[in-house]
């Protein structure tokens, strides 16, 4: 293990970050081995540093939905907070740095698994989690120490990382300085200055060659340029010190992490090195190249999975009622996993060759497992041929697929289903009134004489509840065409708590639903999906969510042009692929505003 004072100094680096001067100096950028704590943590839990609390903390608070889609091309971009690498980005960056060293990621795995999970305290996208807590600091230090120790434990590993010259009996200064420059360029995602190389080189003072290399590896892995998206080296726009065009290396890094969640590859780095990335044609070619890579599609699919909460599932109930309800359905974790994979396949297919409306209206079958195909009443899709269609009139788009409909027990909850559409698909807040009476949020009890719709409607028929529920509950009632496993039905089974099947009753999915564009009469889920596909508010909501996912924060004044560009491409004639690529092509992507 490296010395305790060295580790404490590293922790101080993470807790405070200045913005000027040489590394290691008071008020410096914190990237050197002697950096000290330049600031105190933000209010919050003990040990939280800058970035603790909600994403964008310190920026003016405003209603996020007040930011319009009216683009003024000459307007400044919005102010963006300093962001650390997400845990996914951090792992992929480590993997790229130590690709030549066998077992490096395995050596780091224990410490990596102790890092806080992004999004564990965030209601929206995981990547909007900007916290730096004591757990993060401890984790980063432990990862750096484990990886550095792993490299130094075998001369062959050090040779793979730094060259054979690193294993001489004494320190080869030229070899050492070259390693600092080469490894630092990758870890910091830009070339190091001469001053930085000299300051890292001071780690060789008073120690043997092995400890010098180990110290550099450790120090660079806990430096802010490694752990944060630092953008400090741009050029002033029209003489304005607060508005910067990103430097070529900053732009390369922003683009790569945006599309790949990973650091720039060799080709992208080369365009930054020679400055050609600043050319519009070269930049657009690199955007296209990165977007054509499977890693970009993975990033897009992950967006929809998080937006639609696909990864949130606590397992199926083990009650007698559920056992009766699920007879013959193979209701297990494998069924849910297959349903989640179907969503990924549907999204990937229509991102490549479709538009946003297709995600609401598609009746194509992407069920690859036999159990899920049986639930839909179709043959499994083979994963390569053109997908066939689901039974006519039963399903349309994402909202009607099993992963969006499966509940943990035998019943459905129209309130939850409807609130999701209102809140997440139409971007209209669903706020419970103050002073709710006891039991207000508890589902109504089973009634052998009533359907789920009748029971839930009776619960909120009082004037206190009816007005609010009228805005979102009809969406959930239209989805009563599907049971708690996502099976299409025209009749609802009435099952008591002991698992006795008492009979069945017709399902009513006719609703009068309130959209921002006006009231609509809908006969069921297919018409609901079609109405959402045609809703301008739903299109705007998609643009807002994809902005938040991409920029890791809520939109602010100055983001109107990015939002407008996204919205422009989600209409009936638009391309979902172009919409998702638009963020990188917007002029604001190349600039940073300081306040």
Where in this protein do the model-derived segments appear?
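Ser/Thr-rich, Pro/Gly/Ala-heavy low-complexity intrinsically disordered linkers and tails
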Residues: 1-2, 7-70
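Active-site substrate-binding loop specific to GH73 endo-beta-N-acetylglucosaminidase modules
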Residues: 59-75, 87, 95-548, 559-595
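GGW-centered surface loops in extracellular recognition modules
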Residues: 80-83
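Axial heme c-ligation environment in periplasmic c-type cytochrome domains
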Residues: 551-554
């Amino acid at each position: 293990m490296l010395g305790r004072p060295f580790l404490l100094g590293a922790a101080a680096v993470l807790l405070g970050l200045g913005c000027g001067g040489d590394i290691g100096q008071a008020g410096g950028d914190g990237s050197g081995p002697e950096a000290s704590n330049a600031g105190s943590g933000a209010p919050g839990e003990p040990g939280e540093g800058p970035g603790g609390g909600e994403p964008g903390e310190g920026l003016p608070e405003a209603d996020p939905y007040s930011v319009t889609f009216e683009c003024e091309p000459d307007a400044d971009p919005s102010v963006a907070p300093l962001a650390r690498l997400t845990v996914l980005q951090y792992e992929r960056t480590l993997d790229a740095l130590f690709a030549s060293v066998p077992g490096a990621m395995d050596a780091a795995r224990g410490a990596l698994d102790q890092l806080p999970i992004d999004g564990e305290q965030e209601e929206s996208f995981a990547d909007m989690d900007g916290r730096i807590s004591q757990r993060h600091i401890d984790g980063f230090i432990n990862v750096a120490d484990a990886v550095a120790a792993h490299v130094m434990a075998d001369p062959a590993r050090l040779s793979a990382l730094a060259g054979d010259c690193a294993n001489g009996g004494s320190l080869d200064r030229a070899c050492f300085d070259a390693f600092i420059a080469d490894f630092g360029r990758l870890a910091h995602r830009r070339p190091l200055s001469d001053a930085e190389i000299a300051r890292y080189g001071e780690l060789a003072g008073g120690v043997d060659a092995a400890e010098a290399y180990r110290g550099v590896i450790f120090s660079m892995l806990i430096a802010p340029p490694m752990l944060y998206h630092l953008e400090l080296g741009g050029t002033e726009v029209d003489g304005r010190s607060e508005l910067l065009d990103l430097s070529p290396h900053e732009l390369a890094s922003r683009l790569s992490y945006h599309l790949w969640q990973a650091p720039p590859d060799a080709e992208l780095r080369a365009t930054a090195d020679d400055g050609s990335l600043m050319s519009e044609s070269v930049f657009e070619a690199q955007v296209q190249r990165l977007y054509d890579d499977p890693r970009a599609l993975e990033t897009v699919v992950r967006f929809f999975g998080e937006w639609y909460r696909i990864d949130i599932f606590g397992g199926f109930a083990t009650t007698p009622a559920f056992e009766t309800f699920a007879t013959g359905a193979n209701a297990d974790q494998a069924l849910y996993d297959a349903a989640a994979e179907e969503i990924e396949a549907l999204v990937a297919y229509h991102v490549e060759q479709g538009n946003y409306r297709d995600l609401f209206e598609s009746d194509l079958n992407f069920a690859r497992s036999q159990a899920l195909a049986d639930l839909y009443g179709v043959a499994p899709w083979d994963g390569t041929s053109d997908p066939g269609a689901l039974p006519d009139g039963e399903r349309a788009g994402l909202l009607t697929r099993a992963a969006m409909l499966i509940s943990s027990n035998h019943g459905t909850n129209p309130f939850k289903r409807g609130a999701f559409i209102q809140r997440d698909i139409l971007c209209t807040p669903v706020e419970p009134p103050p002073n709710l009476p006891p039991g207000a949020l508890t589902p109504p009890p089973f009634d052998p004489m009533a359907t789920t719709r009748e029971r839930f409607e009776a619960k909120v028929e009082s004037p206190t509840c009816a007005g609010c529920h009228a805005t979102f509950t009809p969406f959930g009632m239209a989805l009563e065409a599907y049971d708690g496993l996502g099976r299409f039905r025209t009749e609802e089974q009435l099952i008591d708590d002991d698992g006795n099947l008492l009979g069945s009753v017709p399902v009513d999915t006719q609703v009068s639903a309130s959209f921002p564009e006006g009231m609509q009469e809908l006969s069921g889920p297919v018409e609901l999906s079609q109405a959402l596909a045609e809703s301008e508010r739903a299109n705007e909501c998609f643009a807002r969510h994809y902005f938040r996912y991409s920029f890791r924060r809520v939109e602010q004044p100055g983001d109107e042009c990015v939002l407008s560009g996204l919205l422009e491409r989600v209409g009936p004639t638009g391309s979902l692929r172009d919409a998702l690529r638009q963020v990188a092509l917007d002029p604001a992507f190349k600039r940073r505003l300081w306040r």
